[in-house]
C-alpha cells in the first residue's frame, strides 16, 4: 500500500511540475559564516579546487564518502570564502583512512563512507568545531540542511567562492526507489530532497553533511544528473547506521566491522 501511495503521489507531482522542469536551478543561498564550523573541504596536492566535502566529528576525525578517496588528500577546516580565508582556517592531511569496504567496491546504496584520522588534531576556534554523531535516525518529513562548495548550476557547472546551503526534506525510501530504479528493497541510505525539484546537492558536494534538526544524519552520496530535477531526490549515507562502527574505530578497535 505504501508503494502504491508513493507512486500515485509521484504521478500527481510529475504532472504538476512538468512545465517547471526547465526553470530548475540548484537552489540555496550562501551559508551563514557561523553555521558550518564542522564543514570541511577536500582537495588534492595537485589541484586547489575543492572536489568533496566532509564533516569534523571530533578534534581528530573527519567523516566523508568513500568515493571521495584520492591520493594526496588535503583537508581544509574553518573555511568560508576561498578568496578571503578566515584567520583560523587550518589545513590537515589524513594519517589513516578507514572504510567499510574498499573505496573501489562500495555500492550506490551501501557503505559509501570513509573515516579519516587527521595527522594532527585541530582545536576549537571561531570557525572550527565538531558536530556530534546522531542519537536517533531522522524521521520522514524532517527538514534538513545540505551544504557545500559544489556547483550551483547544472548541467553547466558554476562553482561558488563560498559554501551554499539549502533546506531539503527526508523522504520515504520508496520515493528514491521509484525515482532512480535498481535500488534494493532496503539500504543504509537516506532519501532526501524536494519533490518539485530546484534544491539539491550536486557535483562537488559529495561527502558533505546533511544536518537534520541540528544532528549530523547523512553524507552526500549520489543523485540524478542534471541535479535538482523534480521527482529525483538525492541519496545520502545514513550516518546513524554506522555510529557503532565509527565509535569503535575512534576507540582504537581498527578491526571493527560495519553493519551487514
Swiss-Prot record:
Residues 19-24 form a propeptide. Its EC number is 3.4.21.-. It holds the Pfam family Trypsin. Completely inhibited by PMSF, and N-tosyl-Lphenylalanine chloromethyl ketone (TPCK) and poorly inhibited by benzamidine and derivates. Not inhibited by EDTA, heparin and hirudin. Optimum pH is 7.5-8.0. Residues 1-18 form the signal peptide. This is Thrombin-like enzyme gloshedobin. Thrombin-like snake venom serine protease. The recombinant form clots fibrinogen by cleaving fibrinogen Aalpha chain (FGA), and slowly Bbeta chain (FGB). Has amidolytic activities.
